Regions:
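ATP/NTP-dependent adenylation/nucleotidyl-transfer catalytic domains that generate, transfer
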Residues: 1-148
Length: 148
């Protein structure tokens, strides 16, 4: 779903794109998974993301992803969207979890419910995570990468 529906009833295009605001879903899903599931620091997530996404021809793609749906991202793009993710996730989203109604925990392994596995203060500040990302992830790709 998009943030703002199309204002023109004859237009099939939304007035605002969620992905233009928060970043590509595939990158943000990647960020969410590795930060919440493994607790990796932002620079490690950026490293993993770069190695997963910088070259379309490298590695295997799931069978259901057509070639025209495959995206590559350079380091600057990965860092930009990871910075937005870190700020939104750690600084401006946790209060929502403390205001949810009571309910059961369903499933395991990665729940973001305040009744489940994830515990974060509702008044958290993202400064530590943002500083770690900015200090340890360059703004552009290195001249060469180690083989592998």
């Amino acid at each position: 779903p998009e943030l703002v529906p199309a204002s023109d009833t004859h237009s099939s295009q939304p007035a605002q794109s969620t992905q233009a605001t928060i970043g590509p879903y595939e990158l943000q899903d990647f960020n969410l998974y590795f930060i919440t599931r493994y607790g990796f620091r932002p620079s490690k997530v950026a490293y993993l993301s770069y190695n997963a996404w910088h070259n379309i021809a490298r590695g295997a793609w799931p069978a259901g992803i057509r070639p025209d749906q495959r995206n590559a991202y350079d380091l600057a793009t990965i860092k930009r969207w990871l910075e937005i993710f870190v700020f939104r996730f750690f600084q401006i989203s946790q209060f929502k979890r403390s205001a949810v109604p009571n309910g059961p925990k369903v499933g395991s392994g990665g729940s973001l419910s305040p009744r489940g596995d994830w515990r974060a203060p509702s008044d958290a500040v993202a400064t530590a995570w943002l500083n770690e990302l900015r200090q340890h992830v360059p703004d552009r790709e290195p001249e060469s990468l180690p083989p592998g």
